[in-house]
Amino acid sequence: MSSPDFESLSLSAPVLKAVKQLGYEQPSPVQAQSIPILLDGKNLLGTAQTGTGKTAAFALPFLSKIDEKQRSPQILVLTPTRELAIQVAEAFQSYAKYMKGFNVLPIYGGADIGGQLRSLKRGVQVVVGTPGRMLDHLRRRSLDLSQIEGLILD
């Protein structure tokens, strides 16, 4: 049995276009197993070694389901470090390259909270951040979680 290709995984057209442009040819095993489950709206606990494509395994299906016109966060990604928050946010941005009106915001301590507040006010669909800064925004009531459709603990 051959492994699926990205076209057969039911990703949205803009996400699929970005995947192709990034040079992805075949989904990794973790991607091939995870993407259909997440597109179906099911919960998933996925574990795999570093470098196996875990970020794409959760980012691609969630991006395929995002409403680009909605300005409040729909996807929340919690990461343990600022470095990982930045890396994951950059990955989301590259996979969403052809999604008009898409915005992702990395939020973490040590960065200017004023800029984060302005970005949240303008509207973002994906928030990627560390628990401490997320709690800070929740206490300030600057982070609206009422429209969250997906939560990722990375």
Predicted regions: what is each one?
Residues 14-17, 21, 71-139, 147-150:
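Conserved nucleic-acid-binding Ia/Ib motif block in the N-terminal RecA-like helicase ATPase lobe
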Residues 33-44, 55-70, 86, 90-96, ...:
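Walker A/P-loop NTP-binding motif
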Residues 153:
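Conserved P-loop NTPase nucleotide-binding/switch module
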Residues 27-29, 36-37, 61, 79-82, ...:
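Proline-centered helix-kink/hinge sites
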Residues 48-52:
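The conserved Walker
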Residues 62, 142-143:
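ASCE P-loop NTPase motor core, strongest for the SF2 helicase catalytic module
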Residues 1-47:
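Conserved pre-motif I regulatory segment
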